[in-house]
């Protein structure tokens, strides 16, 4: 799962490779990204044979996201018990997607 952090407290997420599916526009909190993290983790667990196959989350912050946005998403990693995550640079294609949706 990749999570894109944008300006105006906006975020988008997608599963799999970039460009293969349209990102889902979401928000912070229990009915937003938290629900998506929990639901996607269950789906990954159900579709992979071994119980130790955990969902991996890639966090990508756009230039207009804030430190508070990053802290909030890291809090969500802890709350939802996501054990494997990384903060990596955002790609130009992902920046374009954020811009298209008004978050960059």
Regions found by a protein language model. Give the residues of each.
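Long, low-hydrophobicity, acidic/polar, solvent-exposed interaction domains
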Residues: 1-104
């Amino acid at each position: 799962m990749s999570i894109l952090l944008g300006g105006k407290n906006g975020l988008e997420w997608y599963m799999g490779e970039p460009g293969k599916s349209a990102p889902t526009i979401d928000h912070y909190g229990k009915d937003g990204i938290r629900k998506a993290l929990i639901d996607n983790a269950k789906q990954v667990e159900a579709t992979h044979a071994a119980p130790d196959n955990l969902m991996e989350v890639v966090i990508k912050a756009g230039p207009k996201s804030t430190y508070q946005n990053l802290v909030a998403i890291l809090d969500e990693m802890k709350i939802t018990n996501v054990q494997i995550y990384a903060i990596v640079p955002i790609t130009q294609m992902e920046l374009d997607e954020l811009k298209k949706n008004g978050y960059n």
